[in-house]
């Protein structure tokens, strides 16, 4: 009578952890393989992340410094974000602060230009 896959699985399921570990080591030695996860898949993910960074379509508008003209910057922040006076003032004084998240490149560039004209230092991330 031939041994079936079910027989092998039943036998393996009855092994202790130590016996199973030894069996895996014997498989590795006999067939020249490794039970370690393949790292190639991880490299492909990292490569995909690099491509995504090059083709970034959403940006975060970060106010780095308000500069000397804090009142002008607060006015622009209020106009861009719709925040109230106190919230805009807190955002300007609590730099670095994220003013907008997930905005398009065009919107981010326009907002950056407005803030820089008001005297602020801005980064797009």
UniProtKB/Swiss-Prot annotation:
UniProt KW keywords: Ribonucleoprotein, Ribosomal protein
The reply on keyword tRNA processing is no
- Domain of life, per UniProt, equals Bacteria
InterPro entries, sorted = Ribosomal_bL12, Ribosomal_bL12_C, Ribosomal_bL12_C/ClpS-like, Ribosomal_bL12_oligo, Ribosomal_bL12_oligo_N_sf
Any single Gene Ontology cellular-component annotation: cytosolic large ribosomal subunit
Q: Name one Pfam family in it.
A: Ribosomal_L12_N
Question: Which GO BP terms apply?
Answer: translation
Keyword Ribonucleoprotein annotated: yes
GO molecular-function annotation terms?
Answer: mRNA binding; structural constituent of ribosome
Role of this protein? Forms part of the ribosomal stalk which helps the ribosome interact with GTP-bound translation factors. Is thus essential for accurate translation.
Q: How does it assemble?
A: Homodimer. Part of the ribosomal stalk of the 50S ribosomal subunit. Forms a multimeric L10(L12)X complex, where L10 forms an elongated spine to which 2 to 4 L12 dimers bind in a sequential fashion. Binds GTP-bound translation factors.
The record's NCBIfam families line, in alphabetical order, gives:
L12
For this chain, the family text in UniProt reads:
Belongs to the bacterial ribosomal protein bL12 family.
Report the protein name in the record. Large ribosomal subunit protein bL12
């Amino acid at each position: 009578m031939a041994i079936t896959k079910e027989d092998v699985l039943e036998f393996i399921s009855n092994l202790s952890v130590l016996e199973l570990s030894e069996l895996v080591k014997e498989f590795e030695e006999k067939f020249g393989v490794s039970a370690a996860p393949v790292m190639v898949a991880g490299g492909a993910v990292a490569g995909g992340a690099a491509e995504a960074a090059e083709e970034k379509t959403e940006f975060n508008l970060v106010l780095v410094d308000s500069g000397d003209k804090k009142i002008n910057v607060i006015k622009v922040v209020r106009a861009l974000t719709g925040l109230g006076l106190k919230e805009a003032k807190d955002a300007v004084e609590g730099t670095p602060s994220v003013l907008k998240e997930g905005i398009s490149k065009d919107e981010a560039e326009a907002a950056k230009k407005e803030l820089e004209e008001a005297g602020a230092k801005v980064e797009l991330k």
